[in-house]
Amino acid sequence: MISVFDMFKIGIGPSSSHTVGPMKAGKQFIDDLIERHLLEKTTHIQVDVYGSLSMTGFGHSTDIAIIMGLAGYLPHNVDIEAIPGFIAKVNKTAKLPLAEGKQVANFDPATDMIFHKTFLPLHENGMTITALADTAVLYKQTYYSIGGGFIVDEAHFNQQEEHPIEVPYPYANAADLLRHCQESGLSLSSLVMKNELALHSKVELENHLHQVWQTMKACIHRGLHTEGVLPGPLKVARRAATLYRMLKANNELSNDPMRVIDWINMFALAVNEENAAGGRVVTAPTNGACGIVPAVLAYYEKFVGALTNEIVERYLLTCSVIGSLYKMNASISGAEVGCQGEVGVACSMAAAGLSEILGGSPEQVCIAAEIAMEHNLGLTCDPVGGQVQVPCIERNAIASVKAINASRMALRRTTSPRVSLDKVIETMYETGKDMNAKYRETATGGLAIKVICS
């Protein structure tokens, strides 16, 4: 089972597949060296990066992420402020301290990290790391970053868990979830809670959900109070802080019934601007789509009612289980299925979560998730300059509003839908696989080649 601990991971921007995943792969490689007693013998490290991971790698800070992983750090606890200085020293000395300095290896990023235009056979995001003793290969491993910060090595690709923990309500699709809810009388979030408690203690679960929401709130706050220009050649100006000042100044005087949309946009922009700047964010389900789930919950708090711990937990658990359906039966990787697998999935998750805390039945929750994805089908991933900025930041704002609209449509529907959530998930995956590779996070088509970076 894909847990809420897997779906919502605290990490850093700008990309879950191209930053968080590669950093975790680097750290896993170092852990493997330590386990095999090879770390102290390692004198040289080489890295080969392939496919989408290579084509948009520099814009997504993939090179930096791999180096920091090899240095022994993970996305949730790496000191973000210390990264630039660490990377500058590695570039200057061509030496890389491994495992937080336990061993120092020769590593010149200019020659020892090669970005290939070719693809590895199993997934669009591949990388191979090699440890050497002088010229002799000590250990070599290929990893795939399969979206949302999930990684898998070559030997375990597409393999099921050997000894999965049994949960009271196992499921493979939305139909299973709805059947369990109908038979048990449980809400969707209550059912997910019971499954999670088979994997984690109540304290662990509550602490994780609390930490996830607090991290999301802190990210919104930073985004609303930080101005300037985002890193990279596009020179994109931050907009959330300016919009915040405008809304605060005019909120009490405005009779515009649409001003709520400005607030929703602002919440999403704040998060995604922080992500683009390499800040601390939560995968939801990915970094490129990390603004939607928090923006919709912030909307609830601002315009619907106060947030209790129970409401936050119900929202996040519902979002998580909907995301898990896409992860199990389709993909949450922009490199594999385009942006429909990132922003589309996040929109679907948030629509479901909002419907749950507004009192929707399990059927209405799944209808909301279906509506949200149905109208994201075919969404391309064509980041300008290989950066998670244009069109990604605005796209999160648009999808946040769309998620709320999908929820409202589902809750006010009086007829049965013709399209099920399972069918739209199946359609999304097939659409993504049919999509030309230039529209799947390679920056070789669409807006990515129409907008010239200065």
Per-range role (PLM):
Residues 17-34, 294-306, 351-359:
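Alpha-helical support elements that line or immediately flank enzyme active sites
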Residues 202-334, 338, 446-454:
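Accessory "access/gating" subregions that flank catalytic or transport cores
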